[in-house]
Regions:
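Short, structured beta-strand segments at or near domain termini in extracellular proteins/domains
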Residues: 205-220
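Short, P/G- and charge-enriched loop/turn segments at secondary-structure junctions
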Residues: 130, 194-205
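A short glycine-rich, aromatic-capped structural motif
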Residues: 1-31, 50, 138
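Conserved aromatic-histidine-acidic binding/catalytic patches
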Residues: 3-4, 8, 42-46, 204
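Feature responds to low-complexity, polar/acidic, surface-exposed segments characteristic
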Residues: 28-42
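Residues within well-ordered beta-strands of beta-sheet-rich folds
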Residues: 5-7, 60, 144, 215-217
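Functional-site microenvironments in short loops/helix caps that host divalent-cation chemistry
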Residues: 40-45, 51-194, 210
Length: 220
């Protein structure tokens, strides 16, 4: 991979609210789930966004700073999560997932999420991975720039793979609860760029769930 710098933290609610004010964008819709669990809207939790909203934020940051900033490719994300491509099952300080040490235990998750116990918590609460990146693969699924195809890496370029040229779903990486496999550094997921939260698919009513989060990359 060509040189890149991945953000130390995911984009926070505070970051995104400031961006919305500076760009005169509407605030993100807040659905019933988030209203019932207002801790998730606190300044130091990850911002929840559609794929395009996440990409727009990163590219705006690039325009303002004069740098090439975007969503990371899936390959960049995994390389960083695995601390330069090492075999590390989890992107924690030691490659293991240890509740109460480098990931919240159940009591902590309850306190962070108004009693619901889902795996979302404030940014930077636990040790980073060896590259200094916090919460990689944890506390939500992170958008990447790539379209998803199950067989993409069987024929992808060796250098700087960018994902398929087109598709219907975008690649996500990270844990949203349930089986720990979702937090594995090599586990692939995908979803529609505007995720369907409910059967009537009303984004203005439901927004997006707390699992759709992101961080940005600076490309050299």
């Amino acid at each position: 991979l060509s040189d890149f710098l991945l953000s130390k933290y995911k984009v926070s609610n505070k970051n995104y609210r400031e961006y919305s004010k500076l760009t005169n964008k509407r605030a993100l819709p807040v659905g019933p789930f988030m209203k019932n669990h207002p801790s998730l809207l606190s300044d130091d939790y990850s911002a929840n966004a559609t794929w395009q909203q996440a990409k727009d934020y990163c590219q705006w940051l690039g325009k303002e700073s004069g740098k090439k900033i975007d969503l990371p490719t899936e390959a960049q994300w995994e390389y960083a999560a695995r601390s330069r491509g090492q075999y590390l099952p989890f992107a924690t300080n030691n490659g293991e997932l240890l509740p109460g040490e480098n990931f919240p235990n159940q009591d902590e998750l309850d306190s962070y999420t108004d009693g619901i116990g889902l795996p979302f918590y404030p940014l930077g609460k636990f040790p980073p991975n060896p590259l200094g990146l916090y919460d990689m693969g944890l506390s939500g699924s992170e958008w990447t720039n790539d379209w998803y195809a199950a067989d993409y890496y069987s024929h992808s370029p060796v250098n700087d793979p960018q994902g398929p040229a087109q598709g219907t779903k975008k690649v996500l990486r990270g844990n949203v609860g349930g089986d720990r496999q979702y937090a594995l550094t090599m586990f692939r997921q995908s979803d529609l760029p505007v995720p369907k939260i409910s059967k009537d698919d009303d984004y203005e009513k439901y927004g997006v769930g707390p699992q759709y989060v992101f961080r940005c990359v600076v490309n050299k």
